[in-house]
Amino acid sequence: MATADPFDSALDLLRRLNPKHTAEHLNNLITLAPDLTEDLLSSVDQPLTVKRCKQTGRDYLLCDYNRDGDSYRSPWSNQFDPPLEGGNQGGSGGDGEGDGGEGGAAGSIMPGERVRKMEIKANEAFDVYRELYYEGGVSSVYFWNLDDGFAGVVLLKKSSPTNPSSSGVWDSIHVFEASERGRTSNYRLTSTVILSLATKGNALGEVDLSGNMTRQVEQDLPVENDESHIANIGRLVEDMELKMRNLLQEVYFGKAKDVVGDLRSVGSLSEGQRDRDAQMEIIGSMRKA
């Protein structure tokens, strides 16, 4: 009998566990199999963590794409926290194309000067998008260089106000590659939404809905300048989020509502039994007639 690949087994196990606790499960797996650390961190989407930039005082989101070892790069200052060994910190306007050392996947390489300028504009654009669509929350955008273009990730996080009886967290992760081909560019976008909703009360008990959904799209769009890239990426992300929201609302939550409605009655059991008895009595009377 062939031995199962440890990495595939770890991914299969994570798919069967509550996605609300993905970060905890991931840490446990890494403890058990340290040699899978980099592969798991780069392959598993987990709820986003918020950190504050020490240079600007602005919040930003952490992921594998802005990670280098145990350090994370702020999109606002372009600085790593904690500082990288060797002093390779980049900067708000430097080209910073040197390797950042061992660690995260694409996030270990600082973006070049041109890509960094686009990254700054993208963060400004999605900061406005976040405020308009989410009315709060945190957003971060990270770009890095590719041989035939560039790639990046758009992160958005919104948590409901702290409430002892209910909670909700939305994390969306949009990873894209842009391959430049003259006056057009090919965009490949992979979007993941991680959603967690929980509520509890004396009347309805405790309900916990958690899960994630991933969708992909590829499209060729015209490009006139670097600002066109920002507009194209923004349009792709906006369209994808709209589609995924509709899917969640109409398909997933709609189906969950139907299942709960079939399994659980809002009224008391005695009232339900009385209704059934009355119904049977009416049916019996009709048969006698």
Swiss-Prot record:
What Gene3D superfamilies does the database record attribute to this sequence?
1.20.58.570, F-actin capping protein, beta subunit (3.90.1150.210)
Biological processes, Gene Ontology terms:
actin cortical patch organization; barbed-end actin filament capping; cell morphogenesis; filamentous growth; mating projection actin fusion focus assembly; mitotic actomyosin contractile ring assembly; mitotic actomyosin contractile ring contraction
Keyword Coiled coil in annotation: no
Keyword field contains Magnesium: no
PROSITE patterns from the entry?
F_ACTIN_CAPPING_BETA (PS00231)
Q: What is its main location?
A: cytoplasm
**According to its UniProt record, where is this protein located?**
Cytoplasm, Cytoskeleton, Actin patch; Cytoplasm, Cytoskeleton
Keywords assigned: Actin capping, Actin-binding, Cytoplasm, Cytoskeleton
The record's section on InterPro entries has: CapZ_alpha/beta, CapZ_alpha/beta_2, CAPZB, CAPZB_N, F-actin_capping_bsu_CS
The segment annotated Disordered runs over: 73-110
Q: Name one GO molecular function term.
A: actin filament binding
Which segments show compositional bias classed as Gly residues? 87-106
What are the annotated GO cellular component locations? actin body; actin cortical patch; cellular bud neck contractile ring; cellular bud tip; F-actin capping protein complex; incipient cellular bud site; mating projection tip; medial cortex
**Pfam families reported in the protein's UniProt record:** F_actin_cap_B
Provide the family line: Belongs to the F-actin-capping protein beta subunit family.
Q: How does it assemble?
A: Component of the F-actin capping complex, composed of a heterodimer of an alpha and a beta subunit.
Q: What does this protein do?
A: F-actin-capping proteins bind in a Ca(2+)-independent manner to the fast growing ends of actin filaments (barbed end) thereby blocking the exchange of subunits at these ends. Unlike other capping proteins (such as gelsolin and severin), these proteins do not sever actin filaments.
Its recorded name reads F-actin-capping protein subunit beta
Q: Which organism is it from?
A: Neurospora crassa (strain ATCC 24698 / 74-OR23-1A / CBS 708.71 / DSM 1257 / FGSC 987)
